[in-house]
Amino acid sequence: MMSRGDNMKVLVAMDEFNGILSSYDANRFVEEAVDSQIEDADIVQVPLFNGRHELLNSVFMWKSGTQYRIDVHDAEMNEIEAQYGQTEDGLTVIQAEQFQKGTGHYLNHTSYGLGEVIQHALNKGAKTFAISVGGTDTFDGGAGMLQALGAVFYDDDGERVDMTKGLGQVKHIRRVDTSGLHPQLKDAHFQILIDFSSKMYGKQSAIMQSYKTLHLSREEAVEIDNLLWYFSEIMKHELKLSLGQIERGGAGGGMAAIFKTIFNAEIMTSHELVDQITGLENLVKQADLILFGEGINERDHVINTSSLRIAELAQQYQKVAIALCGTSEKFEQYENLGVTAMFNAFDEMPTEYPDFKLGVTLRAYTVQVVKLLNAHI
């Protein structure tokens, strides 16, 4: 067991493993291993999150506050219980992926439920929001959300178009009235978390990049993409908004572009919010050893994840940093950033695997890593 004159400061910052193991649980297994090998180690865990998962739980591991459970609607307008939180320092945290789910055709899915959650928070005085919109089952360009917040869509005959019925209704829209939007929105500040690069429509749209993993045909994806283009044209004509060129605007099926253009939202990566909430850079600066990693299996359109940010900071402050990952997909990037050593549990990250078994594997790798370091310190 390693022993030092001063307590060794160890930073443990594991991201999730493809929905199998949460950031919190991955951290716990790694911490157990460190604790078994380094006497009196001063271990700090940083629960991470990304633009799809882990946001709510991770934030409330660092901050105190109140979590609410409210009845809203899922992507298919079925009643569902949603959970969101408000921290004591005024940050409202919403993880849209928790309740914006559906099993039917994406043309019939709506983002109305997210609007309901935002409305509930606004009614409780919320002014600052952090919202992750990735991983939802909606591609309605945020139209359902806008309707829940007070916007009205009209057809040629002046009749209302009901966007709770999904993107398929977009083709009927001719006029948009936002005068009835919730009055508190004008004072609200939104931070939208996105770790994946996509536009609202076109070759780089979210739907065109992901339709195969969503089990859609290319023809179905093109139909959705064309409707999103039409919706953006309506919004340009009616509200003078340019949705198509917003960087990362395709997240949440186009919700990110709406947040940016209508509500002047700040689009940010998850690691930027991690920095903001946890003081990650200072924790890296103080650490003697950093153990980090992830099992996020997203090949084509990853912008950045917190693990890459940690590697950058470790290089900046010349720290010993060990990556414990589900796969080797980011190893070249880690290598370029000077990560000390890298280990992967799988050749390809599985979609199903016993969580405890994965945790034990991480713990075993960590024990061996620390033993190697112990032999050279």
Protein language model features and the residues they cover:
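Methionine residue identity
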Residues: 1-2
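N-terminal loops that bind phosphate or other acidic moieties
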Residues: 5-133, 137-377
